[in-house]
Amino acid sequence: MTAVQLIVGLGNPGPEYDQTRHNAGALFVERLAHAQGVSLVADRKYFGLVGKFSHQGKDVRLLIPTTYMNRSGQSVAALAGFFRIAPDAILVAHDELDMPPGVAKLKTGGGHGGHNGLRDIIAQLGNQNSFHRLRLGIGHPGHSSLVSGYVLGRAPRSEQELLDTSIDFALGVLPEMLAGDWTRAMQKLHSQKA
């Protein structure tokens, strides 16, 4: 069981993307930072907002890339490389089209599923895809031609409340995730329903 050393929240930078569906991962890390009393500070060396807290005597770093989504790997690789964090000690929180709002699931490894942020992270980590993912459901607009506008749009209040609930569920299994007990974390998280 590899303990988590880096938690990444994916999104796009700037106020025009704030609270959009595509920024669900960044929202998770913002909420986590707040819960841990951590300030996220811009660091150009890592192309993102960074923070850290201690868990059982070990540093856990937080990162929200300030690159655009399709360049997220630049930020993740810079920080992971500097601190020598292996891919299996990284958790990436991201929006998931294939799950409805209110659902959060964990996954270890796998492909990018068409998610440009995950695609770039896999590429920048040297085609290593063994990192863990926190998938936050945002739902699907129904047709692939509508996806871009959908993910870059803001969800109605009812959907946003469901996303907030799924983030609460995910924060509830933080101790298991930090300990690297993915089986227990998945059992607890996957049994939650918004």
Swiss-Prot record:
GO BP terms: protein quality control for misfolded or incompletely synthesized proteins; rescue of stalled ribosome
Source taxon at top rank: Bacteria
Active-site feature positions: 22
Binding site for tRNA: 17, 68, 70, 116
Entry's EC annotation: 3.1.1.29
The protein's enzyme class: hydrolase
GO molecular function: peptidyl-tRNA hydrolase activity; tRNA binding
Compartment list: Cytoplasm
Record site: Stabilizes the basic form of H active site to accept a proton: 95
Annotated keywords: Cytoplasm, Hydrolase, RNA-binding, tRNA-binding
SUPFAM superfamilies for this protein: Peptidyl-tRNA hydrolase-like (SSF53178)
Entry's Gene Ontology cellular component terms: cytoplasm
Function in brief: Hydrolyzes ribosome-free peptidyl-tRNAs (with 1 or more amino acids incorporated), which drop off the ribosome during protein synthesis, or as a result of ribosome stalling. Catalyzes the release of premature peptidyl moieties from peptidyl-tRNA molecules trapped in stalled 50S ribosomal subunits, and thus maintains levels of free tRNAs and 50S ribosomes.
Record text on subunit structure and interactions: Monomer.
Family per similarity comment: Belongs to the PTH family.
Entry protein name: Peptidyl-tRNA hydrolase
Organism per entry: Pseudomonas aeruginosa (strain ATCC 15692 / DSM 22644 / CIP 104116 / JCM 14847 / LMG 12228 / 1C / PRS 101 / PAO1)
